[in-house]
Design a protein with these regions (language model features):
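HAD-like aspartate-dependent phosphatase fold
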Residues: 1-116
Length: 116
């Protein structure tokens, strides 16, 4: 299914990405990424906060983000319009881009997995 959306979606991690922290602590903001995401949202795009945090640790992260001027369209969940579009809420976040300090691009992965 090829659906054309009028906006794009970024899902972003928290620890080590938005915030230089060591879970469950809160640390220094990644100001460059925060500014980028604010501009992205100002252009009409959507943001999903996608950390591994839950409970109080998640609530603290969301509050920390608000204090940095970041508001998210969803937290640890798909956007409601995506759920409606597909008729279910998959465990994998549907987005155009994932930003995470632990990510590995496919070309990098091919190099890592190459057996010589």
């Amino acid at each position: 299914m090829n659906i054309e959306m009028s906006y794009q979606i970024i899902a972003v991690d928290f620890d080590g990405t938005l915030c230089y922290s060591n879970w469950p602590e809160l640390g220094e903001p990644n100001y460059a990424l925060i500014a980028y995401l604010q501009r992205w949202k100002d252009m009409g795009n959507k943001l999903i906060l996608w950390p591994c945090r839950a409970g109080d640790a998640l609530a603290n992260a969301v509050d920390w983000c608000r204090k940095q001027g970041l508001e998210f369209d969803a937290v640890n969940d798909n956007l409601p319009e995506i759920v409606a579009l597909y008729g279910n809420n998959s465990r994998k976040i549907t987005c155009d881009y994932y930003i995470d300090d632990k990510m590995l691009h496919v070309p990098e992965l091919v190099g890592v997995c190459r057996v010589t």
